[in-house]
Amino acid sequence: MLMLLASHEQDIAEMKITKNGRVVSKQQDNREVGLRHYMKDHYPAIKIINLELPIDGTRQQYDNMLEQFFTGHPNIHHCITLGSKAHVMGDFLLRTNRREVQIMGYDMVKKNAECLRQGSISFLIAQHAYQQGYCSVDALFKAVVLKKKIQPVNYMPIELLTPENVNFYRRTQL
């Protein structure tokens, strides 16, 4: 979805939340592998510029790092965050009145939703956490209690949330 907007760019940013220089979740790591593979296959001329923010950073540290990043990369207009902290950049963009940067983020957490409504995040990928949790417990019950064979892979739906449809997202729907 981001590439519909950024296909003409030379560079895009990827914001990562890290601890000791490593991403903090396996999901975030897997998403990055998928992103880089997709970009290599479909947009090989576009360079991904990394921005690493420490998980235990303060707002002031984030502001300093983001200011330095955007000053050093004035042609960055699109950013993807592969974890649930898109709001860190979204808040910064709102406070510094940078309207030319579009963010794609993950996870429908409250702070991300607020930034989406205010326009500093362009869209979010929501993954129906309640449904995932239900399916996980259901599979565990079937495997352990009922001794049934379960499928090792369970594909789940995602939703693309925008400022126009975010208020209709049914977070707790099974």
How would you name each of these model-derived features?
Residues Q10-V23:
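Short beta-strand segments enriched in small/hydrophobic residues
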Residues M1-L4, Q118-Y130:
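Short beta-strand elements at the ligand-binding edges of bilobed clamshell
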Residues G21-V33:
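Glycine- and acidic-residue-enriched helix-capping/strand-helix junction motifs
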Residues K110-G119:
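Glycine-rich, charge-decorated loop segments at or immediately adjacent to ligand/cofactor-binding or catalytic sites
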Residues R22-V23, M39-H42, Q131-L174:
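Hinge/cleft segment of the Venus flytrap/periplasmic-binding protein
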Residues M1-A13:
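A conserved helix-loop-strand patch within extracytoplasmic ligand-binding domains
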Residues A13-E14, R36-R59:
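Short beta-strand elements in bilobed, periplasmic/extracellular small-molecule ligand-binding domains
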Residues P54-K111:
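Hydrophobic alpha-helical
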